Every structure is written in structure tokens, then in C-alpha cells.
Amino acid sequence: MSDRVLEINALAKELKANLKQFPNFPKEGILFEDFLPIFTKPDLFNKLVKAFKLHVGEQKIDYVIGLESRGFLFGPTLALALNAGFVPVRKPGKLPGPTFKVEFQKEYGSDEFEIQQDVIPKGAKVLIVDDILATGGSAFGAGELAKKTGAEIVEYLFVMELDFLKGRDKLDAPVYTLFGGQEEKFTE
């Protein structure tokens, strides 16, 4: 393994040790892993951004697209670390000016996202970031919006992944998660 991969793995291990677990949240049978404690400690927040920056390496990234709302927590900071712009993907009616809109399927129904039409130039290289990859519906929707702008999706980045939901199967660009989440549902 390269030194870079070893460093990312060490950072991921330390970050994962700082998660809090909540059994049966938000519903029975789910073990919720809360990554918000990372943001209460500046050294951990810096390590989260460093791990993603190390992963991206020397790839040229023009924009980081963050999903509402947890993609907003680290997306702008990662964009700054990569010398890239940050572009939010939001629920309908939250962005001024002309927007592209997409409807996507989630675990329990459908939802919509929007992105401003004129903020990403055609051919720009983008990362799409969010906290958790679950069913892949939200990330898929953001990817469809990125395509409408003419951007090239370099990769989807997530802090965690609920592997058993197979959300990465819905995405048509490489997927990277700092650490995998649950492989199956929680049972007591």
C-alpha cells in the first residue's frame, strides 16, 4: 500500500472512532451512525478534509457540488482545500435565478433537487459530496443535475456508506467512501 493510502486509512480509523451510534434511529431496526461529533473538534474536521484531499490527489477539480444539507457541512471546506468552487444542490425554491430541476426516487417516495443553471461551465470537472450513501437516490439526482450543466462528474465522495442498500449501483461515476457503514440492518 502507498503511503497516501496508509495515511487515509489511519485518518479514517481515527474519524470513525469518534462517531456516535444510536440504535433504532430514525426507526426500529436501524443503527444510526452520527458523524456530527467530527465537526465539534477542529482537529477532526481538518482530518476529514485532509483525508478527502489526499484521496483526490493531483486530480484537477473545478467545483465541489454539495447536497442539501449535510453536504454543506464539509463541501465548502473541501472545495477551498482543493482550490475549487462550491456549488449547492438544494430543495426546490431555495435558489435564486434560473435553475435546473430533477426528480429522483428515494427509499420511501420521490424528491426533487435544483441547481443554478449558470454557475458551472460546460466541461467543468466536479466532485459530488454528501455525508452518507444510502439508497443512492439523492446522489443520483445531484448527478443528473451536474449533467444538465454540462459538467463532467469525476467522482462521488461520501463520509460513510450503508453498504447493504447498494446505493453505489445507481451511480454512473466512481464512488469513494471514507469508511463503509453497516453491511446489514441492526438487530438487537
UniProtKB/Swiss-Prot annotation:
Question: Highest taxon of the source?
Answer: Eukaryota
Q: Which InterPro entries match?
A: Ade_phspho_trans, PRibTrfase_dom, PRTase-like, UPRTase/APRTase
> Where is it localised?
Cytoplasm; Nucleus
One GO term in the molecular function aspect is: AMP binding
Detail which positions bind AMP: A134, T135, G136, G137, S138
The alphabetized list of GO BP terms reads: adenine salvage; AMP salvage; purine ribonucleoside salvage
The UniProt record lists the EC number as 2.4.2.7
Question: GO cellular component annotations, sorted alphabetically?
Answer: cytoplasm; fungal biofilm matrix; nucleus
Which transformation does this protein catalyse, written as a reaction? AMP + diphosphate = 5-phospho-alpha-D-ribose 1-diphosphate + adenine
The cross-references to SUPFAM superfamilies, in alphabetical order and at most eight, read: PRTase-like
Q: How does it assemble?
A: Homodimer.
Q: Which HAMAP family does the record match to this protein?
A: Aden_phosphoribosyltr (MF_00004)
Q: What is this protein called?
A: Adenine phosphoribosyltransferase
Q: Which organism is it from?
A: Candida albicans (strain SC5314 / ATCC MYA-2876)
Q: What is the lineage of its organism?
A: Eukaryota, Fungi, Dikarya, Ascomycota, Saccharomycotina
